[in-house]
Amino acid sequence: MKVYLDAVSTTSLDPEVGKTYKKLLDEYYCNSDALYDDGVAIYAMQEKSRSIIADTFGVKKDEIIFTSGASEANSLAIKGLCFRHPERKHLITSIYEHSSVYNSFRQLEEEFGYDVTYLDPDKDGHISAEMVKDALRSETLLVSIMQVNNEIGAVNDVESIAEVVKKHPGTYFHTDITQGVGKVDVDLKNIDMASFSAHKIHGLKGSGVLIKKGFVNLSPIISGGQQEYGIRGGTSNALTNIVLAKTLRIAMENKDKYHDYLVQLHDQLIDGLKDTAKINYDKGLMTLVNISTPVQSEVMLNALNDKGIMVSSKSTCGSRKNELNRTLNALGIDENYALRISFDYTNSKEEIDYFLKTLKEILNKYA
C-alpha cells in the first residue's frame, strides 16, 4: 500500500486539469505571440485565463503576472522591487520564510548591501502586525511575510500586517500565499504583491503567478521581450498558463466541498498520534501536523518509506542539503526528530489508519 502524506510539498495532478492540458498539447504548439490564427487563438485563451485568475482574487487583469512558480514569483517581487528602488535599503522579513524568499533577502544583504531585519515567530508560531510595526523604519522599502508557513502550518494575519504597512509611506508589502490558496481565504485589498504555485493545488509544476498591484513598479529579473507587461521576458508557457485558471477554480470549489471531510481526517490523525508521538504544532492549517518521535527523523523516513508511506522531515527545497531548519529552530523544536505530515482530500481514512498503525510498529521496533 502506498500512502502519500506530503501534500504541502506537492500534489497529484487533478484529472480534469491533466485532460485539458493534454488536449491543448495535441492541438496547439504555436507561439502565443505570433500573429497568425493559431497564435492569436492561444494568446486569447491565455488572456481569458488571466482574467479568470484576476477575478478570483479581486484584482485587475494586468495585475496577474505568469511565472514558472512561486519561487520565481517571490524572486521577481523582492529583487525586482529592490532593483527598481535602490535608494531605500532596509527590508523586513521573517526567519521562517520559504527558501525562495529567505535566500533572496540573504542575497540582497550579502551582495548588494541591504539591511535586512529578520523577525522571529512568537511562541505560537506567528509573525504579528505589531512585530512588523516595531521593525519599520523611515527607509524601509519592503516587508515580506508568508501567509501560511510550510513547515508547521502557522497562519499569519497578513491582512493586518498589510494594514500596518499601508500606513507607512514608501513601503510595500508582499506575501507568499502558496500554502494558503484553496485552504485559507485572503483579502488582497491592502496587499501589494502575492505569489503562489499551481502544483500545490493539484496543478502543473512549473506554473505560478505573481499578483502585482498596478502602482508597484518592478525591474525584470528575466530580461527579454515584452511578455508579461515587460517584466518577465521569454516565450510564454501559454498552455500551462491557460490551465491554471481551471486549476484555481477547482481548488476554490474543493475548499468548501471537502472541508468537513478534511476535519475528519485531521481529527483521526491527531487522535491516533496522541499516544505515539509528540505533536509539535497543530494550531494552524488543519491539513499539516508537525510531530516528534524518540527515533531520529532519517531513520523514521526510511522505515516509513519501506512500508510505502511518504512523509517529510523538512521543507523539500532544503531536504537534500544539510541546511538548518529555520522554522523548527526558531520554535525550539529539534529538527533531528521531527516529521511533517500533510494530507488533502485525495487521502482516505484507511490511509491514515495504515500510517498510524505503521508508525506505532516502527516506534516499537526502534524506540
Feature locations, PLM:
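Pyridoxal 5′-phosphate
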Residues: 1-367
